[in-house]
Amino acid sequence: MFAIGNLDERSEKIMRVTKECVELGLKAAKPWGHLGDIAHAINSHAQANGYSVVEEIGGHGIGLEFHEEPFVSYVTKKGTEMVLVPGMMFTIEPMINMGKDAIVLDKANGWTIRTADGAPSAQWEIMVLVTEDGHEVLAY
């Protein structure tokens, strides 16, 4: 993740906390665990720092197509969602907001997502492979 221009302390903090959320989610990515374990780690840390996690933006499976299943939510509970099986590849890429979790789609380009309340936001993405004894980061 990088910033454009000079950042104030609040912006530096949300970038740092977002990276920490991803790292905590990664620690929870274990074979025979659940996607919800990753969500719990991310959401708990974001909320503990006064931030919200966007429900509609999540990670995705990696395969032959762009954005394959499973959808990796960051607002589900520990011990829920799909079981993490060795060989699974997916992204961990939460969108963490300073304000509320609501977002809007830029209708001009049909791609850009903005916070509905105009508050700053940060996103960090990694690609993970679940292995027999843990995980491997494929892209950071």
Task: Please report, for each region that a protein language model flagged, where it lies by residue.
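Active-site neighborhoods and metal-handling regions in enzymes and metal-associated proteins
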Residues: 1-140
